From Swiss-Prot:
Catalytic activity: L-methionine(out) + ATP + H2O = L-methionine(in) + ADP + phosphate + H(+); D-methionine(out) + ATP + H2O = D-methionine(in) + ADP + phosphate + H(+)
Naturally occurring in which organism (per UniProt): Rhodococcus jostii (strain RHA1)
Function according to Swiss-Prot or TrEMBL: Part of the ABC transporter complex MetNIQ involved in methionine import. Responsible for energy coupling to the transport system.
UniProt family annotation: Belongs to the ABC transporter superfamily. Methionine importer (TC 3.A.1.24) family.
UniProt name for this protein: Methionine import ATP-binding protein MetN 2
E.C. code: 7.4.2.11
Keyword terms, alphabetized: Amino-acid transport, ATP-binding, Cell membrane, Membrane, Nucleotide-binding, Translocase, Transport
Subunit structure: The complex is composed of two ATP-binding proteins (MetN), two transmembrane proteins (MetI) and a solute-binding protein (MetQ).
Transferase recorded as keyword: no
Stored PANTHER family: AMINO ACID IMPORT ATP-BINDING PROTEIN, METHIONINE IMPORT ATP-BINDING PROTEIN METN
Record-listed ATP binding positions: 41-48
Location of this chain's protein in the cell: Cell membrane
Length: 340
């Protein structure tokens, strides 16, 4: 893959009186053409500023932003408009014109671009069919559900056939079921149209559902960058660990361990699970050592066709047998025994 967006030592500061706020701090980042790239961070992490730097709505204080091999940092406003014509944008609050029909909203970028009326009609019909709203062409936004409004927003963003789609908290105002519908549509946009998508979010579930790679932002800096599988399965930065813990509770917390120790009389161990770790082979042989086991906590997650997680086990049997099972587990994965 080749880059479609590059941040080269980009810093963006804002001044308020005598105070200076650093919203984006020395960011180096490459987004590859054709991928779905997630940017996640808590409120104030710099996510929205980052996306505004991509479409030139903000200029960096220092560094370069390169979009489709064009350094947009010092472009004039007129030249920036040509770059923005290849960038679509969808928003949290949809930003539809209430006085225009669904078809009118989708057609708006084409009107601005000077498309002839008949070509506009054909393109709008094509897009509404793509997003599953052909029957809503004459409806108005107030007659639509939240999910339908976002579908209109996606169709409008695709009107001029952009190479890059920026989705800024595009599912934050939706219920969980509708969120999944919209995410499926974004995957369809990426897969069938080849559009690169940058998903800005504070929800790790969104990243897990659609992204190929993810950057974790904290205080304006990229504190972790990698495939979604790597960041989920082995988060390194405190911010990454915090996000992952909100949706994956594979390892017991101290309070959970206290409860497990009081409930189960055997020895308690937590073993990491990775593809090919062969934990099952070790456990299937445990009976031969006079040891029985029970899974008392944990879970396995499949992501990008790979599995990871952890299992907390009670091992019951003679000490030498349990010791041997733990020793064998440690030859295939990381194991931590809970001390009594």
């Amino acid at each position: 893959m080749t880059p479609i967006v590059r941040f080269e030592s980009v810093t963006k500061t804002f001044s308020s009186g005598k105070k200076t706020l650093t919203a984006v701090d020395a960011v180096d980042l490459t987004i590859e053409r054709g991928e779905i790239f997630g940017v996640i961070g808590y409120s104030g992490a710099g996510k929205s500023t980052l996306v505004r730097l991509i479409n030139g709505l903000e200029r960096p204080t220092s560094g370069r932003v390169v979009v489709d091999d064009v350094d947009i940092t010092a472009l004039s406003e007129s030249k920036l408009r040509h770059v923005r014509a290849k960038i679509g944008m969808i928003f949290q609050q949809f930003n539809l014109f209430r006085s225009r029909t669904v078809a009118g909203n989708v057609a708006y970028p084409l009107v601005v671009a000077g498309w002839p009326r008949q070509k506009r009609r054909e393109r709008v019909a094509e897009l509404l069919e793509f997003v599953g709203l052909s029957d809503k062409a004459r409806a108005y936004p107030d007659q639509l559900s939240g999910g339908q409004k976002q579908r209109v927003g996606i169709a409008r963003a695709l009107a001029t056939s952009p190479d890059l789609l920026l989705a800024d908290e595009s599912t934050s105002a939706l219920d969980p079921e509708t969120t999944q519908d919209v995410l499926r549509l974004l995957r369809k946009v990426n897969r069938e149209l080849g559009v690169t998508i940058v998903v800005i979010t504070h929800e790790m579930d969104v990243v897990r559902a659609v992204a190929d790679r993810v950057a974790v932002l904290a205080e304006g800096r990229v504190v972790e960058l990698g495939t979604v599988f790597d960041v989920f399965s082995e988060p390194q930065a405190p911010a990454s660990k915090s996000f992952v813990s909100t949706i994956l509770r594979n390892r017991p917390e101290p309070a959970d361990l206290e409860r497990l120790r009081s409930r189960f009389g055997g020895r308690i161990v937590t073993a990491d699970v990775r593809d090919g770790s062969r934990i099952g082979d070790v456990l299937s042989d445990a009976g031969g050592h006079g040891v029985r086991f029970e899974i008392v906590y944990g879970g396995i997650t499949t992501l990008q066709d790979r599995s990871f997680g952890s299992l907390t086990l009670e091992l019951v049997g003679p000490d030498d047998g349990v010791d041997d099972v733990i020793r064998r587990l440690r030859t295939v994965t990381d194991v931590e025994e809970v001390q009594a």
